[in-house]
Amino acid sequence: MTILVAEDDMIMLKTIEYRLKKDGHNVIVSHDGREALEEIERSSPDLIITDIMMPFSSGLEIISAAKKKNGKKISVIVLSAMGQENVVLEAFQLGADDYITKPFSPNELSMRVKRYELVISGVQSL
């Protein structure tokens, strides 16, 4: 599965990238929102994992762009330190499929990604 990770914190980005690659995924990284928006158009990933607060474009803009992409359903997991209810609700209203608050467990992220991989491949449960 091809996963786009949009995260401006380099340590966090490398942690997520390492875990996803270890799980066998093709990982595309974006260091800011603008790069992520360009990558959505260029590569059309199966899944996006995005932070909310990033330079140039926010994770909320990334969710909107992913959900407007024609021809392909792109699932979005938000991974953010912003756990305020209004932010979480806005993310879901824009079309986020999941929301994980930092700090997070790499094992939990791995299991959630696995769940989306199974859904994408047509299997509905673990």
Please annotate each region the language model reported.
Residues 24-31, 39:
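Short hydrophobic/Thr-rich beta-strand motif most characteristic of the beta2 strand and flanking loop
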Residues 13, 55-56, 84, 102:
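The feature encodes the CheY-like receiver
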Residues 14-22:
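Charged docking surfaces used in two-component/phosphorelay signaling
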Residues 43-49:
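Active-site beta3 strand of CheY-like receiver
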Residues 17, 61, 83-98, 115:
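Alpha4 helix (beta4-alpha4-beta5 surface) of REC/receiver domains from two-component response regulators
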Residues 32, 58-62:
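Acidic catalytic/metal-coordinating carboxylates
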Residues 86, 104-114:
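C-terminal output helix
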